[in-house]
């Protein structure tokens, strides 16, 4: 079930001017789209929208939209913020069925950096994917995907296939896609390269 309920009003005026008037009236303009229905211009009271946004349970989550006595499950797809005031300026909601299979981006987080021998030796975790696109029911969107770095050495590569996804969720990208890697410090890389060159030289000398 959705944790957040947004009480919306339908906007009569659309476009830049309509959105500006909506914000001046203390509301945040938005658009409801998706499904087999036409897009609808909507608005939510600014204080209610900010409260929902700052819970961290709005963007990318299943939300209940309420208009009068009617309700509609939606996914909050995007929120535009003002570059100076950091106030919400506009939002997009996507109509869904609670059990509908959807594709959505989920944040990827890494734990136990201190238990990675490679990182403890000065290595760097190079993250290629900060989010992963998954396919899952709308009412089972994962909060996050967590990868345990325990035991990883320098040179280790983490791929999508290595991630443990929650029940009902499947990766929507190739399993060989690189998520992150543990790279060595430059000095260590240079030292290993030098050792490799010395080993090759010694081997060639032995063959003569």
UniProtKB/Swiss-Prot annotation:
Gene3D superfamilies referenced in this protein's UniProt entry, alphabetically: Ribosomal protein L25, beta domain, Ribosomal Protein L25, Chain P
NCBIfam families assigned to the protein according to its UniProt record, in alphabetical order: bL25_bact_ctc, PRK05618.1-2
A GO BP entry: translation
Gene Ontology CC entries for this record: cytosolic large ribosomal subunit
Single GO MF annotation: structural constituent of ribosome
Matching Pfam families: Ribosomal_L25p, Ribosomal_TL5_C
Protein name (record): Large ribosomal subunit protein bL25
Leader sequence residues: none
Subunit structure: Part of the 50S ribosomal subunit; part of the 5S rRNA/L5/L18/L25 subcomplex. Contacts the 5S rRNA. Binds to the 5S rRNA independently of L5 and L18.
Record SUPFAM superfamilies: Ribosomal protein L25-like
Keyword Ligase belongs to the record: no
Alphabetized HAMAP family for the sequence: Ribosomal_bL25_CTC
Keywords attached to this entry: Ribonucleoprotein, Ribosomal protein, RNA-binding, rRNA-binding
UniProt entry tagged with the keyword Ribosomal protein: yes
Family: Belongs to the bacterial ribosomal protein bL25 family. CTC subfamily.
InterPro entries (UniProt xref): Rbsml_bL25/Gln-tRNA_synth_N (IPR020056), Ribosomal_bL25/Gln-tRNA_synth (IPR011035), Ribosomal_bL25_b-dom (IPR020057), Ribosomal_bL25_C (IPR037121), Ribosomal_bL25_long (IPR001021), Ribosomal_L25_dom (IPR029751), Ribosomal_uL5_bac-type (IPR020930)
Job of this protein: This is one of the proteins that binds to the 5S RNA in the ribosome where it forms part of the central protuberance.
């Amino acid at each position: 079930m959705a944790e957040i309920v947004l009480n919306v009003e339908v906007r009569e005026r659309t476009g830049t001017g309509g959105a500006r008037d909506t914000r001046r009236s203390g509301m945040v303009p938005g658009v409801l789209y998706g499904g087999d229905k036409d897009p609808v211009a909507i608005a939510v009271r600014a204080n209610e929208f900010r409260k929902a946004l700052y819970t961290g349970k709005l963007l990318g989550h299943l939300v209940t939209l309420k208009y009068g006595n009617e309700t509609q499950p939606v996914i909050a797809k995007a929120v535009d913020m003002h570059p100076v005031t950091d106030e919400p300026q506009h939002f997009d909601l996507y109509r869904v069925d609670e059990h509908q299979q959807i594709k959505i981006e989920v944040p990827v987080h890494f734990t136990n950096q201190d238990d990675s021998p490679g990182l403890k030796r000065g290595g760097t975790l190079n993250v290629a994917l900060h989010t992963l696109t998954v396919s899952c029911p709308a009412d089972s969107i994962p909060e996050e995907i967590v990868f345990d770095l325990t035991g990883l050495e320098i040179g280790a590569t983490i791929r999508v296939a290595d991630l443990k996804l929650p029940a009902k969720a499947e990766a929507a990208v190739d399993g060989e896609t690189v998520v992150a890697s543990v790279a060595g410090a430059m000095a260590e890389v240079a030292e290993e390269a030098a050792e490799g060159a010395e080993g090759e030289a010694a081997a060639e000398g032995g063959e003569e």
